[in-house]
Amino acid sequence: MRREVSREPSKYRTHSGGYVDSERIGGEDWAELQRNLEATIPVYDRVNRIATLGQVSRWRRMVRDRLPRNCRLLEIGCGPGSFAEDVEGGELFCLDPIPEMIKVAEPRVNSSRESRGDPAATFVEGTAEDLPFEDDSFDAVCSLFSFRDWYDKRRGLSESLRVLKPGGKLVIIAPA
């Protein structure tokens, strides 16, 4: 059964009396976030290891182990390919809004896939909020450590459900 994610934003009152939308990132903040993420590329894996208190590898393995075998998989926010490089078999699509991340991820992931005899992954520049894929086109959709960076979480979740086949798996890892 499919359920549409409500589009009603969650707003919290600030000390100054204004409101903060906890589910959306403003334009200036989004641009700054992209610049900061791009700057982390050389140390991205190390930053994730520290931010997850050393649990990043375990969490990635846990997600990989729960994916359907030889599925059609979309990873939203692939970053430099840290998760995707170890995904075996199937059709793999890696989406990221930052071209520099894709430039790092593509050779890293496809080198690993080629060495295993897996088909090359497809890399797409884009965001969770506007997925450039047909409805019901993936067996699984995952987002590891990028959900916090989606500029409109409700819209991104709706889009994820739209491209997911009925009965498919949606997995989001977002450390608190």
Labelled PLM ranges:
Residues 168-175:
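Conserved beta-strand signature within the Rossmann-like core of class I S-adenosyl-L-methionine
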Residues 2-32:
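N-terminal auxiliary segments of SAM/dcSAM-dependent transferases
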